Amino acid sequence: MAQDSKILEELYTVIASRKGTDPDKSYTAKLFARGRGKIAQKFGEEAVETVVAALSEGKDELVGESADTLYHLLVLWADCGVEPAKVWAELARRTGTSGIDEKKSRAKK
C-alpha cells in the first residue's frame, strides 16, 4: 500500500472487498457480519480511545489510536455505501469557507 493520502482509498477498497466474506477468516468480515450497530459502536470506542491518547498518552499511542479510528470509520462508510470520494468532495466544497459560515449555511437548509 502507498504511504501517502491514497492509502485511505486503497484501504477502503480492501475493506469493501471483505463484505460478505467468511467472518472466521477476516476481522473486517466479522464486523460486517455483526451489523452496522456493532460497526458504529466500534468506531465510537476507537474515537474515545483516540481522545484519551491525545490527552494523556504519547504521540505513538495517538498515532496508533488514530489509525484504528480511521480504519473503523472506513468500515462504517463501506457498510453505509459511502465512498471516500464523496467525503473528499464535501471537504473540498468546504475548503475556504469559515467553519462558522459553513455551519450557518447548514442550519438554513
UniProtKB/Swiss-Prot annotation:
The keyword Amino-acid biosynthesis applies. It is found in: Cytoplasm. It catalyses: 1-(5-phospho-beta-D-ribosyl)-ATP + H2O = 1-(5-phospho-beta-D-ribosyl)-5'-AMP + diphosphate + H(+). One of its GO terms (molecular function) is phosphoribosyl-ATP diphosphatase activity. SUPFAM superfamilies: all-alpha NTP pyrophosphatases. Keywords: Amino-acid biosynthesis, ATP-binding, Cytoplasm, Histidine biosynthesis, Hydrolase, Nucleotide-binding. Its EC number is 3.6.1.31. It comes from the Bacteria. GO terms for biological process: L-histidine biosynthetic process. One of its GO terms (cellular component) is cytoplasm. The keyword rRNA-binding does not apply. Pathway: Amino-acid biosynthesis; L-histidine biosynthesis; L-histidine from 5-phospho-alpha-D-ribose 1-diphosphate: step 2/9. Belongs to the PRA-PH family. This is Phosphoribosyl-ATP pyrophosphatase. The lineage of its organism: Bacteria, Pseudomonadati, Pseudomonadota, Alphaproteobacteria, Rhodospirillales. The gene is hisE.
